[in-house]
From Swiss-Prot:
The keyword Ribosomal protein does not apply. Transmembrane segments: none annotated. Pfam families: RuvC. Its main location: cytoplasm. This is Crossover junction endodeoxyribonuclease RuvC. Binds 2 Mg(2+) ion per subunit. InterPro entries: RNaseH-like_sf, RNaseH_sf, X-over_junc_endoDNase_Mg_BS, X-over_junc_endoDNase_RuvC. GO terms for molecular function: crossover junction DNA endonuclease activity; DNA binding; magnesium ion binding.
């Protein structure tokens, strides 16, 4: 019987940070918890960062994940938005590493590819697949579903069949191991 691994997935945002926690046992994935960390929109950036750090710390303390995964920042058309998103992501990373969690990072494209099967999937498709993959009775909020999708991506890439077929962690580029 294989051991259970608990994974925390984070979808960082300066206004709403989504999180999802799953347990992985062999090839099976089990829903544990998910939610959204909402920051006061009128608060100074430093206060919003503090909210993200504090709440992620509370989630880690309550659910005790063994691994974490965070979605990487994409470059937005608006540089100020990209910068704020990067700061929220930095807050999430700081909170996770302060709890000594190993952290992996995935692009939105990698998350959509792993969960939906295509990198250009819509948010609704991600939500639908999260519900299907975890056997949920309802649809989580979009940001929470994204957090769960990040956790599932980490599970599929590091604990699934792909990881067993490629134990050295090599990447495939143009059909060849690199």
């Amino acid at each position: 019987m294989s051991a259970t691994v608990r994974i925390l997935g984070i979808d960082p945002g300066s206004r709403v940070t989504g999180f999802g926690i799953i347990d992985v046992r062999g090839r099976d994935h089990f829903y544990v918890a998910s939610g959204c960390i909402k920051t006061p929109p009128d608060a100074p950036l430093a206060d919003r960062i503090a909210v993200i750090v504090r709440h992620i710390g509370e989630v880690v303390a309550v659910y005790k994940p063994q691994q974490a995964a965070v979605e990487q920042v994409f470059v937005n058309v608006n540089p100020a938005s990209t910068l704020m998103l990067g700061q929220a992501r930095g807050a999430a990373l700081a909170a996770l590493v302060s709890h000594k969690l190993p952290v992996s990072e995935y692009t939105a494209l990698q998350v959509k590819q792993a969960v939906v099967g295509k990198g250009k999937a819509a948010k609704e498709q991600v939500q639908h697949m999260v519900v299907q993959m975890l056997g949920l009775s309802g649809t989580p909020q979009a940001d929470a579903a994204d957090g769960l999708a990040v956790a599932l991506t980490h599970a599929l890439r590091n604990h699934g069949l792909a990881a067993k077929l490629n134990p050295s962690g090599m990447q495939v580029k143009r059909g060849r191991f690199q």
